[in-house]
Regions:
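Sec-dependent signal peptide recognition
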Residues: 1-7
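C-terminal motif of bacterial Sec signal peptides marking the signal peptidase cleavage site
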Residues: 12-14
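Bacterial signal peptide processing site
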Residues: 16-19
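Short, intrinsically disordered, low-complexity terminal segments
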Residues: 7-8, 32
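GH16 jelly-roll
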Residues: 22-315
Length: 315
């Protein structure tokens, strides 16, 4: 029995309470993948073998197998960062335990050291933050261009939660650098939703063109009332033609990269998703409020658990 087959068998046997597997077809039709049932209640076993995919090599990964602080591959955003969100980002809300990265949203009051009385800047005008959380990024350690990215995670779905798996380009100003949202969960059109998006530059500074997929959360809970209690597998397949985003092998959005050229501000007519100048780094965060809605205080603390992050690239 060859080594790759042994690795795949080991991975299949170690996925929590998972027992089945499903054959799915790769987006370019060139190979078949055996994917484990990702909807188990537990993370994968510590130090389980990472599966191989035909035609791909594992370029980067974090299995979160070592309890304590996240590895030095990750850096942290600090304080109030974006979108008028309620949380104060800080390192100590992120830990690794029992084979998972755990980002905890807390209802706690912390002073804003940057407070300026009378300021019109939302980041400065708040004397306190009423919530805390963490946002981790590989901006200083890893970025990639084309490939397959997988994240197995269990997300909080209480009102006010805004968990995300996303990427930003490592050059140019937003949104000309290109944003990829593999996962966002928040209130959209008055109802909880799972989103899979990308955006790029429009004609004005900080103006974005969005390709947005919005799937009502009820779509998932109608099939499994315990959906929010389980881990799920988010995947992005990205090449020079398309970007395809999945959850548990269900296609959420397929974006034609012929349509994603910046519209004329800086980086005029560049395409952030196919440009050889650009790579994208990873962010994992749990925002509170903002698009997430008014937080349900009774649901705190909130836990966003990430079993692993894996990036594969074609040979």
């Amino acid at each position: 029995m060859n080594a790759i087959l042994l690795m795949v068998m080991a991975a299949l046997s170690s996925c929590g309470s998972s027992s089945g597997s499903t054959d799915i077809e790769d987006t370019d039709g060139s190979n078949s993948i055996v994917a484990t049932d990702s909807t188990s209640y537990k993370p994968t076993e510590k130090f389980a073998a990472v599966p191989s995919y035909d035609g791909y090599v594992l370029a980067w990964h974090d299995e979160f197998d070592n309890d304590g602080l996240p590895s030095k591959e990750w850096s942290f955003e600090q304080g109030f960062v974006r979108n008028n969100e309620l949380q104060w980002y800080q390192d100590k809300n992120a830990t690794v335990a029992d084979g998972c990265l755990v980002i905890e949203g807390r209802k706690e009051k912390v002073a804003n050291p940057n407070y300026v009385e009378g300021s019109e800047d939302w980041k400065l005008q708040r004397k306190y933050a009423e919530y805390t959380s963490s946002s981790l990024t590989t901006q200083n350690s890893f970025a990639f261009h084309f490939g397959r990215m997988e994240v197995r995670a269990k997300i909080p779905t209480a009102t006010g939660s805004w968990p995300a798996i996303w990427l930003l380009g490592d050059k140019w100003e937003w949104p000309n650098n290109g944003e990829i949202d593999i996962l966002e969960y928040y209130i959209k059109n008055g109802r909880p939703s799972i989103l899979a998006n990308a955006c790029w530059g429009d004609k004005g500074q900080w103006q974005a063109v969005w390709n947005e997929s919005v799937t009502p959360f009820s779509h998932f809970t109608a099939k499994d009332k315990d959906w929010s209690k389980k881990f799920h597998l988010w995947r992005m397949d990205w090449d020079e033609n398309y970007m395809s985003i999945y959850v548990d092998d269900e296609l959420l959005n397929k974006i034609d990269l012929k349509t994603t050229y910046n519209k004329g501000y800086d980086n005029n007519y560049e395409n952030p998703f196919i440009s050889n100048e650009m790579k994208h780094y990873i962010l994992l965060n749990l925002a509170l409020g903002g698009n997430g809605g008014t937080p349900d205080v009774s649901a705190f603390p909130l836990k966003y658990q990430v079993d692993y992050v894996r990036v594969y690239q074609k040979k």
